[in-house]
């Protein structure tokens, strides 16, 4: 069951700020490795805490992709993309 990958406006802006090779790596990873899985939770790690408790993260090198997995609509909504040192701040 293929999943649809969607990006929020802020995630799209963050993707544009990355250099081209890193942005392509993130897009390829999400489409080719995560989107094709029957259960995308098997490749990620769930986040904890009051603000990010329902989100999942995926590692792409030093970058982190924060997602909301919506089972009812079979959609993986990418919330945030950033360096591992900065992506969790402010959430």
Segments the model singles out, each with a brief description of its role:
Residues 1-4, 9, 13-17, 24, ...:
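Enriched for short, Lys/Arg-rich terminal
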Residues 17-20, 35:
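Residues in soluble alpha-helical coiled-coils and helical-bundle/repeat scaffolds
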Residues 20-23, 52:
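Intrinsic disorder/low-complexity segments in short proteins, especially the signal peptide
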Residues 32-57:
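A short, surface-exposed loop/turn module that caps and links secondary-structure elements
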Residues 11, 22-23, 38, 43:
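A sequence-composition feature that detects small, non-aromatic residues
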């Amino acid at each position: 069951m293929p999943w649809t990958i969607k990006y929020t406006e802020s995630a799209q802006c963050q993707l544009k700020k990355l250099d081209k090779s890193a942005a392509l790596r993130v897009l390829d990873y999400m489409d080719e490795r995560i989107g094709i899985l029957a259960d995308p939770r098997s490749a990620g790690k769930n986040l904890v805490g009051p603000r990010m408790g329902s989100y999942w993260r995926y590692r792409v090198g030093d970058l982190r992709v924060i997602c909301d997995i919506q089972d009812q609509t079979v959609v993986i909504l990418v919330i945030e993309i950033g360096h591992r040192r900065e992506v969790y701040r402010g959430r």
